[in-house]
């Protein structure tokens, strides 16, 4: 996800208002679900785990494509203790167990609106609030939430093993509280996503991502962005979490498919001053 501002990155919408982007990030908003009870630690987290060994790596962009405004620079050494991480993102089926057990309502449900990519909107005209500022391919849709990812005319039918979407940082933390889990730090996430490889472009190495060698390795855009997606990899929206091949640590689709939350706040200058050993993330910044 991107920080709010005049120059959004990663093709994501800035949070200009509740009306346009209920589930995106800016300066961390106050949670709207203070009354929700998640019965901390009571949930069944039924996602397989990957053991990630302790080690050191160079964190940040090493290809020259990174953006300082996105907090991808400078390249710096990080050393981590061993930890475990989910092999996949949380699925719709797993998030439904949480919501059904607790009665939890996500922030998108409480706001009554969220941002939907324009090719994926399934909603009556009256529900369309309009494009988000700076990224008009994201449309504010009233009634869009995790149960209705494209809007009120959509559902989770056939999507139980797809990753849950329209989930804010606060929602992710509430799920973790119920499941007796935690979000990974950004350092843990990047280390795990690399799958034990160093000085390569992707979690699988330097082979192309786009199927030019006959093999698709992730769910990414194909075609002319943002107008036409050829869906050459098999998916125009999200893909089931066990699609493609896992990396060296056993993580499925650590790139592509969906954005994923980390525990850290966002501060574009943090890399320049973060500690080498188990960096916890900045004390201040947006989420």
Residue ranges and their predicted role:
Residues 22-25, 31, 36:
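Long, low-complexity intrinsically disordered regions
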Residues 64-73:
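C-terminal, low-complexity/hydrophilic appendages and adjacent surface loops
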Residues 2-23:
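Histidine-centered metal-binding segments
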């Amino acid at each position: 996800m991107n920080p709010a501002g005049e120059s959004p990155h990663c093709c994501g919408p800035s949070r200009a208002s509740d009306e346009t982007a209920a589930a995106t990030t800016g300066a961390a908003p106050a949670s709207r679900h203070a009354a929700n009870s998640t019965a901390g630690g009571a949930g069944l987290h039924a996602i397989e785990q990957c053991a990630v060994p302790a080690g050191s790596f160079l964190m940040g962009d090493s290809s020259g494509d990174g953006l300082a405004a996105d907090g991808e620079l400078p390249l710096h050494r990080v050393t981590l203790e061993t930890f475990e991480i989910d092999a996949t993102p949380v699925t719709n089926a797993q998030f439904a167990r949480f919501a059904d057990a607790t009665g939890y309502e996500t922030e998108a449900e409480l706001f009554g609106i969220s941002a939907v990519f324009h090719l994926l909107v399934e909603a009556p005209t009256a529900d369309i609030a309009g494009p988000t500022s700076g990224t008009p391919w994201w449309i504010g849709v009233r009634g869009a939430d995790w149960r209705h990812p494209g809007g009120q005319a959509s559902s989770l039918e056939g999507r139980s093993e797809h990753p849950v979407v329209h989930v804010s940082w606060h929602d992710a933390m509430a799920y973790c509280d119920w499941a007796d889990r935690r979000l990974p730090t950004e350092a843990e996430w990047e280390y795990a996503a690399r799958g034990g490889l160093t000085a390569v472009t992707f979690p699988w190495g330097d082979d192309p991502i786009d199927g030019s060698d006959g093999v698709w390795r992730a769910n990414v855009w194909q075609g002319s962005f943002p107008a036409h997606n050829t869906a050459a990899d098999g998916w125009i929206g999200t893909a089931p979490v066990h699609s493609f091949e896992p990396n060296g640590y056993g993580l499925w689709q650590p790139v592509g498919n969906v954005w994923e939350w980390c525990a850290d706040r966002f501060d574009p200058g943090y890399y320049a001053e973060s500690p080498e050993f188990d960096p916890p993330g900045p004390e201040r910044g947006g989420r």
